[in-house]
From Swiss-Prot:
Catalytic activity: an aldehyde + 2 oxidized [2Fe-2S]-[ferredoxin] + H2O = a carboxylate + 2 reduced [2Fe-2S]-[ferredoxin] + 3 H(+)
Temperature dependence: Optimum temperature is above 90 degrees Celsius (at pH 8.4).
Entry protein name: Tungsten-containing formaldehyde ferredoxin oxidoreductase
Enzyme Commission identifier(s): 1.2.7.5
Organism of origin: Thermococcus litoralis (strain ATCC 51850 / DSM 5473 / JCM 8560 / NS-C)
Note describing how the cofactor binds: Binds 1 [4Fe-4S] cluster per subunit.
Length: 621
């Protein structure tokens, strides 16, 4: 094969065993890589496992774009059965570990078992070692990466967990390069459960490519197109931070546990304020439009900001000072905690305190930076009753406290940075996301509003009317095919296309130059649909067939309450109309009214092997 190695590196920490597994060209062509390869592995190998048990498989998967000079092709997918949701879980990050894993000669690394004592894996091409990490256990991700570079040199890729992963916080993530994070549904906790502190990779091999000259030509064209885009200069200044002003103007900025869509101190935490604080930019490998805006926080330390962490740790907590928000963000990265879920967990505690449900004097109230910081640390170390409870995530916390009405999650995963009282398409995207409430798979809100953050120096406020047109379901699927499918399989960042308008035509051409396989758009959409159906089948199987359409509903708050302020004050989603939109989504996907893929759909997608497994737990149409 060209473009793929056709090899998966396997490590069994229980038995201290390392081996290489080969997989077929058919699997490579059908699942491409990244999320596709990870979903295929988990379907076959992680059946009815305890997410934090030794039988769960932790998958580090790359795609054909990785390790090569492709536009923003420095991503890696990390996947496992989620300890937070109980279903399929994954996330991606940009890291040199991706480049080195590919150059070491592997398309993926799969870790199983559990070490007796803390270890890290060191990979140098064909040589793989399992080494002691007892001296690293308990250290932050920043400290861990720095110490490992002192041992192995700077020319390596490193993935590590912090105290959050070690203490099995359900939304612990994997960190690389002091600020890049992956695995919102608890991939860091899975890593911690295996006593795996880090993975260090050094690769020196040349990746097999079908047409090097064509790849070079297309990549250069794409890089030039990005730099010459009208939106590039503003993007270079603010990156995703431009979305703070944009969401605030359009009543979508999470504010005080999503109780409102605009924040009175938004100007103090937006992209313009960030510009005045920025000391450097960070980007992923092979990226010429870096989005990591690094500022000095209130404690004089560097903190890498983007929209999501500022929205969830800022306005959502009622905190209006960017240097304080930056401290919370840095702590999350050092501790190895997902900034989004951490922000929603803390905001839930704040609202529960406000309502008198939580009476703990140490619990923070909205706007209380110091107590929010302390709670973040308590969560990472599972200190105290409140820290331990909040470490379980909002779903479990709300169930134990008997207060579900303001628990902002879907399938157990906390909602990311877009408030959807008046945006049914975005609510549908959250409801049907393959990992729970996350925006990366179908950031449909810009299409729904009719304007995007990077369209000028001033965020546009538009005349907007809530509609539930069937085309909204079709648009969600279209974006899921691209954002949650194509880009996650390649594995490449979607931002060149989303933010500065890089033509989608480059991607199949680049894929052909790398692999020699000519994919039509129908082929790519079918591959995306195949992976979505497989991920949904995984959820249904792991839930033993106990599945209903209610699993695809957004949080109740968006149905029952209205916005508290702004031009859409009092407005909210209507459940019957959302339900109709959900039915349209199922129809277009070829799923039944419960949200389970039909037999015929599975056959059309070459997923016949899924049918017998699903029929053991539920009846298929």
């Amino acid at each position: 094969m060209k473009g793929w190695w056709g090899k998966i590196l396997r490590v069994d920490l229980t038995n201290n065993k390392v081996w290489v597994q080969e997989y077929s060209p058919e699997v490579a062509k059908n699942f491409i890589g990244g999320r596709g390869l990870a979903a295929w592995i988990l379907w076959n190998e992680a059946k009815n496992v305890d997410p934090l048990g030794p039988k769960n498989k932790l998958v580090f998967a790359t795609g054909p774009f990785n390790g090569l000079p492709t536009p923003s092709g420095g991503k890696m997918v990390i996947a496992a059965k989620s300890p937070l949701t109980g279903g399929y879980g994954d996330g991606n990050l940009g890291t040199m570990a991706t480049v080195h894993l590919r150059k070491a000669g592997y398309d993926a690394l799969v870790v199983e078992g559990k070490a007796k004592k803390p270890v890290y894996i060191y990979i140098e091409d064909d040589n793989v070692s399992i080494l002691s990490a007892e001296g690293l256990w308990g250290k932050t991700t920043f400290e861990t990466e720095r110490e490992l570079k002192e041992i192995h040199g700077k020319n390596v890729g490193i993935l590590s967990i912090g105290p959050g992963g070690e203490n099995l916080v359900k939304y612990a993530v994997v960190i690389s390069q002091e600020g890049r994070a992956a695995g919102r549904p608890g991939m860091g906790a899975v890593m911690g459960s295996k006593k795996l502190k880090a993975v260090v990779i050094k690769g020196t091999k040349e990746i097999p490519v079908a047409d090097k000259e064509k790849l070079k030509e297309l990549s250069q064209e794409a890089y030039d197109a990005i730099l010459n885009s009208p939106g590039y200069p503003f993007w270079h200044r603010q990156g995703t931070m431009a979305a703070v002003e944009w969401t605030n103007e359009n009543s979508a900025l999470p504010t005080r546990n999503f109780s409102d869509g605009s924040f009175e101190f938004a100007r103090s935490i937006d992209g313009y304020t960030m510009e005045g604080m920025k000391v450097k930019q960070r980007g992923c490998p092979y990226c010429n439009m870096p989005c990591g805006n690094v500022v000095l926080d209130a404690e004089g330390q560097e903190s890498e900001l983007d929209y999501e962490n500022v929205a969830l740790l800022g306005s959502n907590l009622g905190i209006g000072k960017l240097n304080e928000v930056s401290v919370l963000n840095r702590i999350a990265d050092e501790m190895g905690l997902d900034t989004i879920s951490l922000g929603v967990a803390i905001s839930y505690v704040m609202e529960a305190k406000e309502k008198g449900i939580i009476k703990d004097d140490d619990a923070p109230e909205f706007g209380d930076f110091k107590k929010a910081k302390q709670l973040a640390l308590d969560i990472a170390y599972r200190r105290g009753e409140l820290g331990n409870l909040a470490a379980e995530g909002v779903k479990v916390m709300s169930e134990k406290l008997g207060a579900k009405d303001f628990a902002m999650h879907v399938k157990g995963l906390e909602v990311s940075g877009y408030n959807c009282y008046i945006y049914p398409a975005m609510a549908l995207a959250y409801g049907t996301s393959s990992i729970g409430a996350h925006h990366k798979e179908a950031w449909v809100i810009a299409w729904e509003i009719g304007t995007a953050p990077i369209e000028g120096e001033k965020a546009q406020k538009v005349e907007y009317k809530i509609t539930y047109d069937p085309e909204k379901a079709a648009k969600v699927i279209e974006l899921q095919r691209l954002r949650g499918g194509l880009f996650e399989m390649l594995t490449a960042c979607r931002l060149p296309w989303v933010e500065v308008g890089l033509s989608l035509d480059y991607y199949p051409k680049l894929l052909e130059a790398i692999t020699g396989v000519k994919y039509t758009w129908d082929d790519l959409y079918k591959a995306a649909d195949r992976v979505y159906a497989l991920m949904r089948a995984y959820w249904v199987r792991e839930f033993n067939g106990n599945w209903s359409r209610e699993m695809d509903y957004p949080p109740e708050r968006w149905f029952k309450e209205g916005l508290k302020s702004g031009p859409y004050k009092g407005q909210h989603l209507e459940k019957d109309k959302y339900d109709a939109l959900l039915s349209e989504y199922y129809k277009l996907r070829g799923w039944d009214e419960r949200g389970i893929p039909k037999k015929e759909t599975l056959k059309e997608l070459n997923l016949e092997f899924v049918i017998p497994e699903l029929e053991k737990v539920t009846k298929l149409e």
